[in-house]
A protein has these predicted regions:
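Sec-dependent N-terminal signal peptides
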Residues: 1-7
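Terminal low-complexity, poorly structured segments
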Residues: 7-8, 30
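Flexible loop/hinge segments at secondary-structure junctions
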Residues: 16-17, 25-378
Length: 378
């Protein structure tokens, strides 16, 4: 069985102006070879103990988790998985308080957060669970052409220094497009958000000296910005607000049929987010860790520059053998080909590269139970 908090997960089906379709060059995803014993682990994963498993956090990953956990529970009907999409920051807070068995965040826990976890719990294990893009979606009546934006212009829109759709900076990037003489309404997150972190990480990377609002899950946005919690909240606000522009995980943009911008990447190419372009960005940095996780603004002609991994966070030393076994088996199944990763493309996410999947399993094999026993097995 599955119980997923839908307040933060609803994928709205209404559409906005102009098409978001695009043709992109197929790009090889980051490589590596999946471990030969993968099938044996996946079979054992489906034998997790019954009961109830509680988790919370990222809304970036929630549409994927919703489908993956539903599929898992259809194969192991004794286990109910309760995932609440409350935002990365709130999920980490719940994890620190011990009210959830694992959390999800689009940015790994910082040192200040890790310090709040009891030392007796051992090192916190942080594993990638999916790969996705952050789309810059907009509601621009009367404009059918896809809008092009670069780093400086996007930063100006969100720091409040570019306020009109027909501003010279935007017009220069979109020759031949008649842009409305109308004020821009920036749509941003009000809560502590990993999606915000990825977005502002890109803005800082693309504008190292001029982006002054920082790289963080929470930002002191200008007064002109409309602040709404969760990806679903920002999507709903974009839908309801003509002349607005905001950032949402790609699956929310596609499900809402939003128009979204082509962003100028580090190679000088205008690229829209897609499975191929997000994979191309990740391909430029095949090795990621909880301390070296940013993949924004990578080189490569087809790289989409606002891309990132989402992360699952759990204790290395579990205080309950039952809950611990549930956590590692569900997460192992979810993060591997043959399990949850098979669902990624159909939900507009990019599956973890095989090398990253192998890294994830290696980390999950370090998670132990009350007597020090390894909880993940094949």
């Amino acid at each position: 069985m599955l119980a997923v908090g839908m307040a933060g997960a609803a994928l709205l089906s209404a559409c906005s102006s102009s098409s978001s379709s695009s043709t992109t060059t197929t790009t090889t995803k980051p490589g590596g070879t999946l471990a030969s014993n993968n099938a044996a682990f996946l079979a054992a994963d489906l034998k997790a103990p019954g009961g109830s498993l509680n988790a919370s956090g990222s809304t970036f990953v929630q549409p994927f988790f919703q489908s993956a956990f539903y599929t898992y529970s259809s194969k192991n009907q004794g286990l109910t998985i309760n995932y609440q999409g409350v935002g990365s920051g709130a999920g980490i807070t719940a994890f620190e308080a011990g009210t959830v068995a694992f959390a999800a965040s689009d940015v790994p826990m910082a040192a200040s957060d890790l310090a709040k976890v009891p030392a007796s719990a051992g090192p916190v294990v942080q594993i990638p669970d999916i790969l996705g893009g952050v789309a810059v979606a907009y509601n621009l009546p009367g404009v059918s052409a896809r809008v092009k934006l670069d780093g400086p212009t996007l930063a100006g829109i969100f720091d409040g220094t570019i306020t009109m759709w027909n501003a010279a900076q935007i017009a220069a990037l979109n020759p031949g497009v008649t842009l409305p003489a109308h004020a821009i309404t920036p749509e941003v997150r009000a809560d502590s958000s990993g999606t915000t972190y990825i977005f502002t990480d890109y803005l800082k990377s693309a504008n190292p000296t001029t982006w002054t609002l920082g790289t963080s899950k929470t930002i002191a946005w200008p007064a002109t910005a409309v602040q709404t919690p969760k990806n679903s909240g920002v999507a709903a606000s974009i839908k309801a607000t003509p002349y607005s522009i905001g950032y949402v995980e790609l699956s929310y943009a596609i499900q809402n049929k939003f128009a979204y911008a082509a962003i100028k990447n580090a190679a000088g190419t205008y690229v829209v987010p897609s499975l191929n372009t997000v994979a191309a960005d990740a391909d430029q940095k095949p090795n990621v860790s909880a301390t070296d996780f940013s993949i924004v603004n990578q080189a490569g002609a087809t790289s989409y520059p606002i891309s990132g991994y989402s992360w699952a966070i759990l204790l290395q030393k579990q205080t309950s053998d039952t809950t611990g076994a549930q956590v590692v088996k569900v997460l192992d199944w979810t993060t591997h080909t043959g399990g949850g990763q098979d669902l990624a493309a159909g939900l507009d996410y990019v599956a973890l590269p095989p090398a990253v999947q192998n890294q994830v399993r290696t980390q999950l094999l370090t998670v132990t139970g009350t007597t020090g026993q390894t909880l993940l097995s094949k």
